[in-house]
């Protein structure tokens, strides 16, 4: 009896877990975001060859965040991380107007994968502190987010170095994870 009550309470109040895949073009700020969330500070990063994985605790949810390198040569490896992914964080360098079309193509390619059909999509429009940065509405348009019909998505203006917008993004993920949970 006591065990079943504790199981019930744990189900109601226990820690939920969410597997997150964080991707985007190279130099978008994925690793900086990961360690700003994990450590609360800016770390010096080098281009990610392979992946970084960290657990980030937020509002009784344990987010396991897989930060996968974004160079064009290693993007085909992203698919190896798709299984059991509940949420995708797609990071865009808001200042990189030359590559926004490339970002859109990579995002659309990934979202067409069957293994990710139920995954939530959070887009971080990163580097909002730069003077020429595209705002969230412009990035929404350029990525074609309004055409996504069967997917929950959200775009959040962010600045990885200051932390602006990062927790608002996690807030959206946590609220929508709870909505999808049984």
UniProtKB/Swiss-Prot annotation:
InterPro entries per the UniProt record, alphabetical: Arf1-5-like, P-loop_NTPase, Small_GTP-bd, Small_GTPase_ARF, Small_GTPase_ARF/SAR
GO CC annotation: cytoplasm; Golgi apparatus; plasma membrane
Residues that bind GTP: 24-31, 67-71, 126-129
Domain of life of the native organism: Eukaryota
Subcellular location field: Golgi apparatus
Keywords: ER-Golgi transport, Golgi apparatus, GTP-binding, Lipoprotein, Myristate, Nucleotide-binding, Protein transport, Transport
GO molecular function: GTP binding; GTPase activity
Gene3D superfamilies to which the protein is assigned, alphabetical: P-loop containing nucleotide triphosphate hydrolases
GO BP of this protein: intracellular protein transport; vesicle-mediated transport
Residues lipid-modified (N-myristoyl glycine): 2
Family: Belongs to the small GTPase superfamily. Arf family.
PANTHER family according to UniProt: ADP RIBOSYLATION FACTOR-RELATED
Function, in words: GTP-binding protein involved in protein trafficking; may modulate vesicle budding and uncoating within the Golgi apparatus.
Record-given protein name: ADP-ribosylation factor
Record gene name: ARF
